[in-house]
Amino acid sequence: MFWKKKSLGYKLACELPLNTPIRDLSFTVMDTEATGFSVGAGDRLIEIGAVHVDGLSVTDHIFQTYVNPQRAIPEKITELTGIQKEDVADAPAAVEAIEAFCHYVEQCGSNGWVGHYLAFDLLVLKKELQREKYSFNEPPAFDTLDLIGFISPSWDMRDLEHYARSFGTNIYERHSAVGDALTTAHLFVELLRLLESQGKTTLNDLMVVTKKDGSFLSL
């Protein structure tokens, strides 16, 4: 469950044995766009994008919604993302958009969320829910940066496009939530393949590599 004070009744997935092969897992790879980085202050969510990964395949099951931030979008953010006030004027409010996203996650039967620098995206959602008195219970989640840190520990930067080029994976429209989710998904699948080539083939291996504890199994 994601919410405690106001329950919307969504279930992410079920408990999984630690020896579950990575190839048998499914993931929701997601990204957000916001009016800025100060989401704990006045910046707001303006887009959610996601794609479903089944095993080691990026599917065509995509989710996208703009979000009405109930404030102006700074010009520099419009220049960066291409999102204009007309795009969000009739878009759902944040909680409604997050609710739709969680319906998508549930439909996919996802075993966890994935993102590139995912901590920021989770913070964006958490702050939006807190504004409406919802409590956010973070989902089982994996960050491509943690996988990269294991596979290539000498690399220390966050740029998604840099890593996609380095690992030879597809690059989609940048600073678009769907585009970045697709870029992240293809990078994630390649990183999983590299893990498998090193003998890391199970959920337990993935948890160890990304420094997750057993709380992942308490869904």
Question: Which sequence ranges carry the predicted segments?
Answer:
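Acidic two-metal-ion nuclease catalytic site recognized across multiple nuclease folds
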Residues: 1-18, 189-219
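Acidic, divalent-metal-coordinating active-site segment for phosphoryl/phosphodiester hydrolysis
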Residues: 176-188
